[in-house]
Amino acid sequence: MTVFLSFAFLAAILTHIGCSNQRRSPENGGRRYNRIQHGQCAYTFILPEHDGNCRESTTDQYNTNALQRDAPHVGPDFSSQKLQHLEHVMENYTQWLQKIENYIVENMKSEMAQIQQNAVQNHTATMLEIGTSLLSQTAEQTRKLTDVETQVLNQTSRLEIQLLENSLSTYKLEKQLLQQTNEILKIHEKNSLLEHKILEMEGKHKEEWDTLKEERENLQVLVTRQTYIIQELEKQLNRATNNNSVLQKQQLELMDTVHNLVNLCTKEVLLKGGKKEEEKPFRDCADVYQAGFNKSGIYTIYINNMPEPKKVFCNMDVNGGGWTVIQHREDGSLDFQRGWKEYKMGFGNPSGEYWLGNEFIFAITSQRQYTLRIELMDCEGNRAYSQYDRFHIGNEKQNYRLYLKCHTGTAGKQSSLILHGADFSTKDADNDNCMCKCALMLTGGWWFDACGPSNLNGMFYTAGQNHGKLNGIKWHYFKGPSYSLRSTTMMIRPLDF
């Protein structure tokens, strides 16, 4: 309020100064200007126009002013006096203005200081509140930021661990992939080599196939020719068989005569030389049996026209006993794929697998008429036999040709041995009636004829592997042409036993 009154008082003084110290400017159409110089500052006031005499209004103003002087007398030197008077008034006004200014400055200082202090206090309180709020918010945000940072660190740790695991897995996978790539490269190389070899083999096979095809055609031509020749030979054989029957009868009669003569000679020898008879008591196992030895086992016999005695196995149990074993198979421990000389003189052990020998069989069957019995057993334990009432073989010049008559038994209604005669063949002596060499193809030594329905000296096969074996121990009319038997025994006994 004090400041407002001071400004009002200042405005009144300025108005009075404007009326007292005014002048017109001829350039501005009669406007009045009042200029005041105070120190370095100059103040110019533009006063409005008045119709009346300014003196009266000035006088009225002076009447209300506490600092006024007596009006000067109007004289000839009125203008200079008036100017002096105005200057004096201006000095007074200037002093008043300075006082007012000082007063205002002093009051304004205290009031401004108070206002500033209040403003500072209010502002400080507000700032404190704001600061407190900011501190609390900052603390909360710091806590949240710490939590977020912790979560980020945890997540980062998990991601780093997972990344490490993934890196290890990737390394392992890369290592495995590299190994597999190397293996694939090796396989490709092997495949290339195999493909090259296959191509070479295909070329060779093609050449061989062409060769085989040509050979097959040649064989077909040859078979056709052989078939025709065989048919012709069969016709000749039938004619020869008819002629041979008469010869066989004559031969049998001669053999009976020879046997009778041998018996007479034997009796004469027994009567004349007792000690010598003791050294050669048995011609075969029938003599052993008749001498009172009825247990199966190995005995020594003395065969006519043989320089030394021979150990043989005598079967005293089957069908009355007295059987001389000439062949036995049971376990495959002995190889029967042998040559002509071995089959001639025999091989093996009489107590196990063995072949008596073609020369001894010929010598025995030349003494008297003999019966042949063949005991068979398959891999399932089934037994059968074939028996021939007349059996003998020719000498070596006749290739130990087989002669049989009167087949009976349980090993098939038909005989698996050739009844009309067949020569003995081995791997080094091909005497069969086939171009294929049966002894090499079917193995062993046997009376093959044209690779006929039997071969008891073939390869031995164990149970489970004995089916589909053309080169096994076979007896066609007992188990078929490709079934290999487990056990066989060939034995002979005199017909008149």
UniProtKB/Swiss-Prot annotation:
> Cross-referenced Gene3D superfamilies, in alphabetical order?
Gamma Fibrinogen, chain A, domain 1 (3.90.215.10), Gamma-fibrinogen Carboxyl Terminal Fragment, domain 2 (4.10.530.10)
Q: Name one GO cellular component term.
A: collagen-containing extracellular matrix
Name its cellular compartments.
Answer: Secreted
Q: Which keywords, in A-to-Z order, does the entry hold?
A: Angiogenesis, Coiled coil, Developmental protein, Differentiation, Disulfide bond, Glycoprotein, Secreted, Signal
Gene Ontology BP terms? angiogenesis; blood coagulation; cell differentiation; Tie signaling pathway
- Give the InterPro entries listed for this entry: FIB_ANG-like (IPR037579), Fibrinogen-like_C (IPR036056), Fibrinogen_a/b/g_C_1 (IPR014716), Fibrinogen_a/b/g_C_dom (IPR002181), Fibrinogen_CS (IPR020837)
A GO term for molecular function: receptor tyrosine kinase binding
Report the SS bond pairs: 285-314, 438-451
This protein's major location comes to secreted
Q: Where is the Fibrinogen C-terminal domain?
A: 276-496
PROSITE patterns cross-referenced by the UniProt entry: FIBRINOGEN_C_1, FIBRINOGEN_C_2
Q: Where is the signal peptide?
A: 1-19
Sections of the chain in a coiled coil: 158-256
> At the top level of its lineage, which domain of life is listed?
Eukaryota
- Which residues are glycosylated according to the annotation? 92, 122, 154, 243, 294
SMART domains, sorted: FBG (SM00186)
* Subunit field text: Homooligomer. Interacts with TEK/TIE2. Interacts with SVEP1/polydom. Interacts with THBD; this interaction significantly inhibits the generation of activated PC and TAFIa/CPB2 by the thrombin/thrombomodulin complex.
State the protein's purpose: Binds and activates TIE2 receptor by inducing its tyrosine phosphorylation. Implicated in endothelial developmental processes later and distinct from that of VEGF. Appears to play a crucial role in mediating reciprocal interactions between the endothelium and surrounding matrix and mesenchyme. Mediates blood vessel maturation/stability. It may play an important role in the heart early development.
Q: What is this protein called?
A: Angiopoietin-1
Native organism: Canis lupus familiaris (Dog)
Lineage, highest ranks first: Eukaryota, Metazoa, Chordata, Craniata, Vertebrata
